[in-house]
């Protein structure tokens, strides 16, 4: 019985929300890979998404804290020689380090799933994750300035 923390980011508002996903909904995420898109309707109990919105898996981390890496196939743990993100940020240019990473497939040993909302192309409504009144005012001013 997997339990996941789903961190859902909203590209319109720039905000993120965290949800606790348990069975049977968690079983729908098992087997998905980084980059896969699923219908946003499955999260109707947690957040109201606009019609036609999808959720794109962008990453995650395992129970030991190792990040999921798109280049490692399957739900495995591997040591890689990392030169940069994801999983390692070198202090100097050219530095490399052996790091433990997870594969690109979600399994029972994944604890956190990172995802982003993919809006329909013709969507122009408010963001799914609400923002404050001041931030909304700034956002509308930027859009008006860009339109001019």
From Swiss-Prot:
Which Pfam families does UniProt cross-reference here?
Ribosomal_S6e
Which GO molecular function, any one, fits this protein according to its record? structural constituent of ribosome
What UniProt keywords apply to this chain's record, in alphabetical order?
Ribonucleoprotein, Ribosomal protein
What protein does this entry describe?
Small ribosomal subunit protein eS6
Cited NCBIfam families? PRK04290.1-2 (NF003293)
Q: Which Gene Ontology BP annotations are present? A: translation
Which protein family is named in the record?
Belongs to the eukaryotic ribosomal protein eS6 family.
């Amino acid at each position: 019985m997997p339990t996941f923390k789903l961190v859902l980011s909203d590209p319109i508002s720039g905000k993120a929300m965290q949800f606790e996903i348990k069975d049977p909904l968690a079983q729908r995420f098992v087997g998905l890979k980084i980059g896969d898109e699923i219908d946003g309707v499955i999260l109707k109990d947690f957040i109201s998404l606009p019609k036609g919105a999808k959720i794109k898996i962008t990453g995650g981390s395992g129970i030991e804290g190792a990040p999921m890496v798109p280049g490692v196939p399957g739900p495995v743990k591997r040591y890689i020689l990392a030169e940069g993100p994801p999983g390692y940020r070198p202090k100097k240019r050219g530095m490399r380090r052996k790091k433990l990473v997870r594969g690109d497939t979600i399994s029972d040993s994944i604890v956190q799933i990172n995802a982003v909302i993919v809006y329909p192309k013709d969507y122009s409504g408010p963001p799914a994750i609400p923002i404050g009144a001041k931030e909304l005012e700034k956002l509308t001013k930027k859009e008006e300035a860009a339109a001019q």
